[in-house]
Every structure is written in C-alpha cells, then in structure tokens.
Amino acid sequence: MSIEVKNLLKEYGAQKAVNAISFKVGKGEIVGFLGPNGAGKSTTMKIITGYLQQTSGEVFVCGINVAEEPLDIKKKIGYLPELNALYYDMYVREYLGFVAEVHKVNSPRSTVDRVVDLVGLTPESKKKIGQLSKGYKQRVGLAAALIHDPEVLILDEPTTGLDPNQIVEIREVIKKQGKNKTVLFSSHILQEVEAICDRVIIINKGVLVANDTLSNLQKGDKDNHFVIVQFKDPLDKIIFEGLDSITKTEQLQSTRFKLQT
C-alpha cells in the first residue's frame, strides 16, 4: 500500500484538527480528499508529507514510517501545498533547475524541459515567476512536485486560481500521472473530485465520514438510511450482528460506527 494512515490524531490544545482517522491509498489510485474548508484536509496532507508532526497515530508511505524517516519520505513524495511557496525573483526554468538539483535529478536540463511541457508552462517558461498569473504560478508548483518523478503525489487543491480551460488541462495531467503513481488530491468542490478520482475520502471537522467509490456514494438508495453513532469506550462492530434492522456496519473509528438500516 502506497499510503497508509492509522488512527491519525492532531490536536491543537483542546481542538482536534484531525480526529483518529484511518485510510489507505494504493498504487495507481487517484483518490479525492473531499471536505469543507477547515475540515482537516491540509493538516492531514502536511502530516503525510512529513512537514507536520502528529499528536498520535501512524502514517506509512511506501512502507516507511513518516515520523521516523521524514527525509527519506520527501524523496518519494511530490507535494503541492495549498499555499504554494515560490521564489518570485527567479525565472521559471531557473527555479525548476534549482529544484531538480536539490533532488539530485539526472539530466536536470532535459527533466526541466519535460515537466515544463507536461504542465503546459512552455509559453511562460522564460519569465520570472513573479510575472506569472496565479494559474501559471500553480503550474510551476505542480512542475516542481513532479520533477523528481515521485512515487506518490500529494496535491492540496491543485486547481485553485485556474480558469476553466486550465482546470481541464491540469485534470488531464493528474489523470496521466495517476496511471503509474499514487495520487491523493484534495478539494472542497465535489465536481472536481468527480472529474478525476477513482475513490473519495470525505472528512468533516477532522472526522472521516465516508470512504468509498464515487459510484457507490452516488447510488443513494432511497430505501436505505444510515446513522453515525459514537460510544464512550472502544467497541467491536460484532456487537451489531444479528440486529434485524441493521443491514450494514462500518467502523469509522474505535468508538464511532456508521450503521445502515
């Protein structure tokens, strides 16, 4: 499994930004990480990429414990953060060449040419980053995330600031990368996730509320209803077996269950 998150908890004082969530993402999957602003998506992604320490729980990327080997993890991950930090006084190719050298990429010049073409930066590639539109700055960040050919891509709202045509182009780039890589792609817009993702993980107020394929989530059988219940102490979902009114039980956390009737 390329990404494995186990009972991840991140607390800021009394606030639980991420509340004991667990999920897995396999190679070749493009998984949408959906939720409203402030749901905990960016916090989770920062922990997965080794830029933020969790309060408890474990995260593994390509079998490596992120908390124990944060530098090794960064070699395997291409990360586009929500706030894309760029050097505005550097030229596009100059900056990407610098990133390639940091990652010790073989043939940095040809690699820069490849990613510039891949993300559609060619017309603007000789400009300073500070002269670019917000959409093209976003492309520079995506190119930097791809430059070392990582196994895993973590993209935090990658289409922010793009016009409709640019959004379609970037979606195609992400789809192509998803054939050989693991992609976790966050958004607060359902249509964005529908366009490119195989599966959706939904989080709200730090709690995982759904983890399923789009087709299953969209079926919406009107005869079925579900309720989420939480107990004080951890329980095994076997306690719900034999109850005629419950057709399906999903354990969201050790004390939290989704019951379908």
Region locations from a protein language model:
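ABC transporter nucleotide-binding domain
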Residues: 169-260
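Residue-level marker of alpha-helix boundaries and capping positions
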Residues: 103, 260-261
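ABC transporter nucleotide-binding domains
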Residues: 2-5, 10-204, 210
